[in-house]
Amino acid sequence: MSTFFMFGKYTQEALNSISAVRTRKAVNMIQKLGGRVKSVYALLGNNDLVFIVSLPNAAQATVASIALTKMTGISFTTSIAIPAEEFDKQFNHNKN
């Protein structure tokens, strides 16, 4: 499983529909795709929220991002999170 950060930006319509029920539906949808929601945070700044999720692969992350946008009206940008240890190892491996 890989970790993904799914950053969301509310539209006015999505903002007006904030609810715990919608959040639970989003979590359930990720689980149906074979994933697990590690955390969900509301943010201040450029993004309004972030889902930190584990999913089998980038293809499933893409499906989840599109499905969440369709379900919630929230625009999502999804990024894979690479553990620093793994990133350092790959970087040093490619330097040689």
Label each PLM-derived region with a short phrase:
Residues 1-96:
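A compositional/biophysical signature of low hydrophobicity enriched in polar/charged and small residues
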